[in-house]
Design a protein with these regions (language model features):
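Short hydrophobic beta-strand that contains or immediately precedes a catalytic carboxylate
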Residues: 1-4, 168-169
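Substrate-contacting helices/loops that form the catalytic groove of nucleic-acid
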Residues: 3-112, 190-229
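Positively charged, low-complexity nucleic-acid-binding target-recognition regions
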Residues: 105-106, 110-229
């Protein structure tokens, strides 16, 4: 499950063998347009009048942001429930302390926090577990194992793999997030000898900051060969 910039969330229903059963783009364009309009008015007001008397306007923007986050979190949990998911996997976010940076950046990260919090509450009611994986490189690396991607300058929702293939950035990231969860779950249940053997054959799975969906497929293939031997 990727909390993207281009869409509010991209969900993929994934089995442990890497089979993707379903996927969904969750987006609330009218709510985002409204928030963007408010932020534009705040920016113009600051240019004309400075930062004084801006607090109430930022408070309104934050309320809109919170409502958008809660709608997104509920939608994620409901989608997982409809598809009989056992666990929802997020990227790990630092959930404590202050958020630094520009106010627009603060709103975006704060929204991600609120989405996760709301989704966890809703998921627990459905009996669905919530887990987290390392966020490093989930968007930067192509899910097919071809390496770092480049962004399409004409369409920021798309990225270009080194093979020249165009793909949705957030969808690729959602595959990598799901794969990191399954890689971790598979590896930790194995006896030490089997784990060492698989890690020697698929060394990428030892690097939790750079493993991708393609590594899960290779791991499952090697694991199948190991069990058949």
């Amino acid at each position: 499950m990727d909390l993207g910039i281009n869409t509010d969330a991209v969900c993929s229903i994934m089995r442990s063998d890497g089979t993707v059963l379903d996927r969904k783009f969750i987006n609330f364009p009218s709510e985002k347009d409204r928030l963007s309009h408010v932020l534009g008015r705040i920016r113009r007001f600051q240019k004309e009048h400075g930062s004084k008397q801006i607090g109430s306007r930022w408070a309104y923007a934050k309320r809109l942001n919170t409502e958008l986050a809660r709608k997104t979190g509920r939608s994620i949990a409901e989608y997982a429930h409809e598809n009989h998911a056992d666990v929802i996997v997020f990227e790990y976010l630092e959930m404590k302390g202050k958020i630094s940076g520009k106010k627009r950046q603060k709103l975006h990260l704060w929204k991600k926090r609120e989405i996760q919090t709301m989704c966890e509450h809703k998921a627990h009611r459905y009996g669905i577990r919530v887990s987290h994986v390392c966020a490093w490189n989930t968007s930067r690396l192509a899910y097919d194992g071809s390496g770092p991607v480049s962004r399409d300058p004409k369409n920021h929702s798309l990225c270009v793999f080194q093979s020249g293939k165009q793909y949705n950035c957030d969808l690729s990231a959602s595959y990598n997030i799901g794969a990191r969860y399954w890689i971790r779950e598979i590896i930790k249940t194995l006896p030490e000898t089997e784990r060492s053997s698989l890690e020697a054959k698929v060394p990428a799975v030892k690097r939790r900051t750079s493993c991708v969906y393609a590594d899960l497929l290779i791991l499952q293939n090697e694991y199948g060969c190991l069990k058949a031997a």
